[in-house]
């Protein structure tokens, strides 16, 4: 009996200690610095021991990647890669000097990579916004760039641009929601204004995980601007739509995400132990600083939500090609989060919402694959000016889905439709 009591006491104090640790973690996450460190994980940074300028170590030709620096309006320096398809590397082998020092040039506009894009009116651009942690050359990211470059043809070369947000890799600064939006808009402003002057209709934006939130925010900023006069705005007035916007493994917003997010599918969702304490859950959610409301942003982009303070009267006649792809076996951000974004974009639960389903396809045997297409024909005539495609695929997980053919086909479809 004494031994049983001793075991019960040990179990009790072990549970009490675990509970205390959990409560301490939740409370610590209400502090801005700790919260953002956990969200962005930018301190998990292989750039401390990896040289991102040595692009051969990531599987590229030295001549295939032109590193560059980009200075934001708030004076942060972002590091990026301009990646070329192999057929351009072969065709312009003499111009692309493999003996040049690794790293960004003092004047990027003097580089062959810049000239190959700037002087080709048929060239296309894919902007890739990566997820949290590490840098632009980490994990599956180089493979995803190679997949995108593989879509390039001599008639329509595809150039890929990727940056590290502020505080990531060797970029300066500290990440915040508005900070990352500034970073994304700065890159798109760089591409769409002088000296490049690339029309948005030749640009597809692809985001994965955290990058989907950046993608949605940048697209919204280009569509509507910002009511804040001090915020970054599109460099070109009333820009035309992007060729496509693709969200891979997205989430509706951060308060919703923390109810279901699991680190690598190993940990339980952070608020799951508080399911029986809704007030405490609400308190924890209310302390989230960077909410990243992708669901709200796509609803405004599709015209389902028209409550934007400074609605652009010209936007109703403009196109939107939005694709949302989520893997059924994503153990980090469950596919239902992607479905929430689809529901917000299409107004699935909004009475008298505009638009309607134009296509749906599901596995006949009740399998995981699903395709839904919604169109909002709010423009003149019968043109479908807003289109949203939802794809749930069986495989790809959270990160690898960005390297799968489904993602490549979405980019190809965006350029060709």
Label for each model-derived stretch:
Residues 87-123, 150-156, 224-240, 305-319, ...:
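Intrinsically disordered, low-complexity domain-flanking/linker segments in eukaryotic proteins
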Residues 205-207, 246-248, 325:
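Short beta-strand immediately N-terminal to the catalytic nucleophile in serine-hydrolase-like folds
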Residues 129, 165, 247-248, 393:
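Alpha/beta-hydrolase
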Residues 71-72, 280, 285-417:
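Serine-hydrolase catalytic core
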């Amino acid at each position: 009996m004494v031994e049983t009591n001793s075991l019960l006491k040990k179990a009790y104090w072990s549970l009490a200690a675990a509970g205390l640790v959990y409560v301490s973690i939740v409370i610590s996450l209400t502090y801005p610095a700790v919260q953002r460190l956990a969200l962005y994980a930018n301190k998990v940074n292989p750039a401390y021991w990896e040289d991102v300028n040595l692009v051969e170590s990531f599987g590229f030709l030295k001549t295939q990647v032109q590193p560059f620096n980009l200075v934001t309006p708030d004076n942060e320096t972002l590091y990026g890669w301009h990646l070329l398809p192999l057929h351009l590397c072969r065709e312009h082998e003499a111009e692309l000097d493999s003996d040049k020092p690794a790293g960004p040039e003092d004047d990027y506009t003097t580089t062959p990579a810049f000239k190959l894009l700037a002087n080709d009116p048929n060239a296309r651009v894919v902007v890739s916004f990566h997820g949290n942690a590490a840098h632009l050359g980490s994990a599956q990211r180089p493979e995803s760039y190679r997949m995108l470059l593989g879509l390039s043809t001599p008639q329509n070369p595809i150039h890929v641009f990727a940056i590290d947000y502020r505080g990531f890799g060797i970029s300066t600064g500290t990440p915040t929601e508005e900070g990352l939006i500034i970073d994304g808009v700065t890159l798109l402003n760089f591409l769409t204004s002088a000296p490049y002057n690339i029309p948005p209709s030749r640009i597809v934006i692809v985001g994965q995980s955290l990058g989907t939130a950046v993608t949605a925010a940048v697209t919204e900023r280009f569509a509507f601007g910002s009511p804040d006069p001090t915020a970054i705005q599109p460099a070109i007035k009333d820009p035309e739509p992007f060729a496509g916007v693709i969200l891979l493994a997205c989430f509706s917003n951060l308060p919703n995400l923390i109810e279901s997010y699991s680190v690598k599918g190993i940990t339980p969702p952070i608020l799951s132990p508080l399911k029986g304490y809704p007030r405490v859950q609400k308190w924890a959610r209310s302390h989230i600083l960077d909410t990243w409301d992708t669901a709200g942003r796509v609803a405004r982009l599709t015209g389902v939500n028209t409550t934007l303070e400074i609605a652009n009267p010209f936007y109703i006649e403009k196109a939107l090609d939005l694709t949302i792809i989520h893997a059924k076996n994503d153990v980090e951000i469950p596919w239902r989060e992607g479905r929430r974004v689809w529901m917000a974009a299409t107004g699935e639960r909004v009475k008298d919402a505009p638009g309607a389903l134009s296509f749906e396809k599901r596995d006949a045997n009740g399998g995981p694959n699903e395709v839904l297409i919604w169109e909002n024909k709010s423009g003149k005539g019968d043109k479908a000016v807003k289109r949203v495609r939802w794809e749930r695929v069986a495989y790809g997980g959270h990160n690898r889905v960005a390297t799968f053919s489904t993602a490549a086909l979405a980019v190809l479809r965006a350029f060709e439709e």
